[in-house]
Amino acid sequence: NGTIDAQTVRAQAKRIQDADVVVCQGEIPPDGIAEAARGAKRFVFNLAPVIDVDPEVIRLADPLVVNEHEAALAATVLGSTTPHLGDDSDAALRELLNLGCRSVVITLGSAGCVVGGPEGFDAVAAATVKAVDTVGAGDAFVGALAAELARGRSLIEGCRFATAVATLTVAKPGAQASYPSVGEVENIRQGEQA
């Protein structure tokens, strides 16, 4: 990830422009993130870890995906002076939207996530499972969300699917080895709707 700079992204400009969704995260150099964001139809930005990135790049995200701590830091990068945003995910969500973010998802671990944007606001609860290993859960969430957005799903529906994926991921050891099948995700989602 550390080698994906602006030059590398420019070399793939056609692929980025043609992609339905482009995903970046904080382990990519800031100039590479900025170049990808500006060329993408839809830019999903997982600001993890939080890095020094141009505030306008954060505002291009649709959605910005962060945890509670990262949400507070992102709000500060965007100019917020509101204290204790890391303690109130709903307040952090609204603050990030007020600061110009297109849409925001704040992941809450075993509590699911909150999501807000032009489609509205929602709190997505996670099913209760015995957590065995949380490694890879955030990546699973972001990947599943991006895939659902690329399939044309709404942000809120994408978050419901991604929350189910992350929930199942923590129930097994390992990172990629713990990622569930679509069938497993649909089974847990049917249980939520019952």
Regions of interest found by a model, annotated:
Residues 14-17, 59, 99:
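Structured loop/turn residues at beta-strand edges in well-structured enzyme cores
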Residues 51-52, 76-194:
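Conserved phosphate-binding/catalytic region of the ribokinase-like
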Residues 3-4, 8-9, 19-91, 111-113:
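Conserved beta-alpha-beta core of the PfkB/ribokinase-like small-molecule kinase fold
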Residues 13, 18, 26, 193-194:
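Intrinsic disorder/low-complexity segments enriched in polar/small residues
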